[in-house]
Amino acid sequence: MCQVYRVKIYLFISTLLFSSDVIENKEFIPDVRLKDINKKKVKLLDLCKDYYVLFNFWNMACEPCKKEMKFLNQFHEKYNSYNFKVISINMDSPRSMSKVKKYVKSSKYSFEVLQDPRMDVFKKMGGSIMPFVVIADSSGSIVNKHIGYNLGDEKALEEEIKRLISFKIDTTKIDAMKNDK
């Protein structure tokens, strides 16, 4: 009887230890504040509350970044009602910020643009090449990363967005069908 009790305790403790290893290895959005292009400080984790967030890292010299951002803006507008949003993080120097503001305004982007001029957040999230995309869930847990951009990548990215928000979309359709009756 005592032996069975010890085995149960061992299994319980092993399960706890294994579970904590899994949790510790999970990647999260860093708990930091960045300034937006109007110099207002924003906490990254607060942006994730109730949303899937696609963080897009870019700079003005990156032409593939600019091509990708057109699609990201479409995704931001198309899926925002499904608790999905795009947050763009620019990595140009502070002295280039007037050019960044002009570009964002002339492109009519509807997503929020933050600044990471020292590339600290970019590096913390594992970035090495631009454009760099990180998708996080509402807890700030990183669920996907994508490096670079080639024409057609936006299709795979949109499929990933649809997959992540599919539960929300399905329940919305069910609610709509109930209301039609």
Regions found by a protein language model. Give the residues of each.
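N-proximal helix/coil linker or "cap" segments that precede and/or mark the start of modular domains
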Residues: 5, 9-31, 48, 170-173, ...
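A short beta-strand-turn-helix
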Residues: 33-53
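Short pre-active-site segment immediately N-terminal to redox-active cysteine/selenocysteine motifs
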Residues: 51-53, 58-61, 129
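Hydrophobic beta-strand anchors of alpha/beta hydrolase catalytic cores
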Residues: 54-55, 86, 133
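Conserved redox-active cysteine motifs that mediate thiol-disulfide chemistry
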Residues: 57-74
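Thiol-based oxidoreductase modules, predominantly thioredoxin-like and allied folds used
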Residues: 83-97, 109-118
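Short, internal strand/loop/helix patches
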Residues: 103-138
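Thiol-/selenol-based redox modules, centered on thioredoxin-like
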Residues: 135-181
